């Protein structure tokens, strides 16, 4: 239960705080927040919980809100936290536990494969966003998400996924260009949605990567107001 509270507390506060800082202090906040998320939620590495918790953090970081919208975001996260706690208690209340909350921190060891993976993912994701911010490029979270998706607990898996990622990024770009040329301009805003549907129906990572490029390229077109290739 304490781990759930800790995870949601980080999601409520750290992304908003990091967005108020310059790139280097924000990097420090991201390192601390992501490492804590890994320790609290990713002890069982084969569950790939980082793809939920760290991804959630990066999305909250990238889509920043303030004022009344931030209050509503916190309220929504609080409701989600309570719901998760209720479900967790209902399903796990009779299960014996041999570890306490503080054992999660005691077992953090850089000599273990799990501990090294925690630190590796944390530094790679945070550094990618730092470089994007220092270069003044928008949407730094996308660099973090891309790095997170290939930084897996097992090295062999990282190599295989990295190879398929760049190949299917090219495939996704090619399909996007075809859609951009074929569809009427009024349909351009929906290309990202088409990609989202494609991701949902893709069972494997390669095609998920291909369809994910639709959203990224759609945002790029809006950011840089690229003229239509027909012009």
What is each PLM-predicted segment?
Residues 51-59, 147, 191-196, 212-217:
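Central hydrophobic cores of alpha-helical transmembrane segments
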